[in-house]
Amino acid sequence: MVKRNQRKKSAPKKRLTKAEVEKQRAIKRMILSVLMALLLIFAMLRLGVFGVTTYNMIRFLVGSLAYPFMFAWLIYLFCFKWLRQKDGMIAGVVIAFLGLLVEWHAFLFAMPRMLDQDIFLGTARLITRDLLALRVTEFVGGGMLGALLYKPIAFLFSNIGSYFIGFLFILLGLFLMTPWDIYDVSHFVKEAVDKLAVAYQENKEKRFIKREEHRLQAEKEALEKQAQEEEKRLAELTVDPETGEIVEDSQSQVSYDLAEDMTKEPEILAYDSHLKDDETSLFDQEDLAYAHEEIGAYDSLSALASSEDEMDMDEPVEVDFTPKTHLLYKLPTIDLFAPDKPKNQSKEKNLVRKNIKVLEDTFQSFGIDVKVERAEIGPSVTKYEIKPAVGVRVNRISNLADDLALALAAKDVRIEAPIPGKSLIGIEVPNSEIATVSFRELWEQSDANPENLLEVPLGKAVNGNARSFNLARMPHLLVAGSTGSGKSVAVNGIISSILMKARPDQVKFMMIDPKMVELSVYNDIPHLLIPVVTNPRKASKALQKVVDEMENRYELFSKIGVRNIAGYNTKVEEFNASSEQKQIPLPLIVVIVDELADLMMVASKEVEDAIIRLGQKARAAGIHMILATQRPSVDVISGLIKANVPSRMAFAVSSGTDSRTILDENGAEKLLGRGDMLFKPIDENHPVRLQGSFISDDDVERIVNFIKDQTEADYDDAFDPGEVSDNDPGFSGNGGAAEGDPLFEEAKALVLETQKASASMIQRRLSVGFNRATRLMDELEEAGVIGPAEGTKPRKVLQTN
């Protein structure tokens, strides 16, 4: 009885609550997930025999899609709850994966080696081969599951049709995974089709307009050709000097001596070939001996001059002494350039109102009382002009550049304190979008004088006004900036501007392009003195040829009694107006070096000497330089070069040191690139910020082809640098002297005299670059004059005088 009561008293097991049951299930699920994840990781990494075998077993099921399958399984294990909350996500993934299995198996049985194989047996044979050999080498399509799906689909729709079925499965799966409904998809497709239709219609209209432009251009060229033929026919007609009537060549009976010459090609005459003894000229024979002896054909104007006395004309006859090859030369028109696209800066206006408030609040937080007077929206930056209160020091505002950039969320802020000519301080903040300034837009808005051949539009200031500069007043220009900052585009814009104004007989170019790609497009234009120089060794000699030309011109000016090229050309015009013998004016010469750093590495002394001499004297001789470099360091832009090239154009650089090398002040390190520049001409103390014009390669090619179609290049052999070799004195590939340096004996004598040897001493005493000085030190060591380098200790001199 007692035992029965004890049995009754033993309480049954405590039933778990629902929360505890769920917790145990979650723990079991987590343990299983971790074990399964470890299994999958071993299989994915194929670790040992177990990993390879497990991987091949999964390949047996899903084939070569084993990796995506295992990765999706891992995501499912740890994101189960999240996936359950997404309606259709799991179903979409499964359906899309089945479509991929069909695609993979269709690709497998499209291979030639599987065409006559049974689908199940062929697939199993491939997988079993890898499974037994413990390797993974064969492409097995979608595995046995893929074979199971592919066989009925291929039977019903063929192998090609199975691709479409698999693709439909994938689309259906993606559709289930995304929150789109059928209406959204149809609406999206309809909008895309409408946009394509509109784009097609616009493209069709553009093609029609382009065809019409080509047709009109062809008609224009035909009319111009007809007019040229008419001018040529009229030029060949003979005028009777007594009656002034036009007569046929066969009926012409002119009795004076020069009548026969009227029907022949004009003869190339030197200045003094037919001067009479009693004629008084403005020049002596020796004075113009330097002038080009072969200057091309001239119009035969002697008949006109002879008939002047017979016709008793009191008024002087105006003569044209332009070479015949350039009489019909037409300057390029602005229509050759692509039209500029409209710019929308409405966002900037809204941003300016906000920034004005931010600026005033920021200054107020630092205890500085200022007021924003005005804001000017430029192409690349917006300039806020602020007026500080009385007693506020300017440097307090200048020191807040970084704080202002932080407050305005700007890339960088440049402070101009103060603005030249104003009692205001300028704060330049980059725009959210840079508005491109096209060359055509700048040319049309520029007020440059067309009579000034070297006055070219350069860019737009912050206030939107076009700015021009006259290279003749510069008189030389240094262009420097990092790679991709817009330096080469600016040089192309300057060249194109000059080509738009000047005939080949008015301006000549010498272009030096060691990079071989920037200026080569200008080859064969008649404005070139010689082809574009791409060899750095030849460039040094070419610059020396320009120096020789400068000296020759000064000798000519001295004999004539004029001070500059303008005075000389005026004398030529007066002489040609009063004499039958015609002389051609001297053209302006523009020397363009696109990469100065490369030249300084090859022949620094020769290049620097030539640049310095041209910088000191070439202005009056009508010779101007444009020097461009992407490495604005002091070993490239030396102090003497800076002193003789006073006008500077700085693009974006990496540091304030480079900015000071170019402009002698900071600022260029805060530029934005893409044509954003600081321009400091010779007549201004502070640089001006401009957005340079953009000229595309297509625009340059069009203007070059327009010029080439009119006339051919006529190079001047006097400027040809000739051939160079590795043994030329003063050159070497590493920037020093070649073997057998001509300064070796001088360096040896210097070392023996001072009993000291250092590269810096040779640099100072022999005026050579560092690379050449170190090369001389190596040669002195090889000759046994000095000992080897001993760290920081000076070298020992082994010989005595």
From Swiss-Prot:
GO MF annotation, one: DNA binding
GO cellular component: a single term: plasma membrane
Positions of the UniProt region annotated as Disordered: 715-739
Membrane topology: Multi-pass membrane protein
Domain writeup: Consists of an N-terminal domain, which is sufficient for the localization to the septal ring and is required for cell division, followed by a linker domain, and a C-terminal domain, which forms the translocation motor involved in chromosome segregation. The C-terminal domain can be further subdivided into alpha, beta and gamma subdomains. The alpha and beta subdomains form the DNA pump, and the gamma subdomain is a regulatory subdomain.
Family: Belongs to the FtsK/SpoIIIE/SftA family.
Protein name (record): DNA translocase FtsK
Organism of provenance: Streptococcus pyogenes serotype M1
Lineage: Bacteria, Bacillati, Bacillota, Bacilli, Lactobacillales
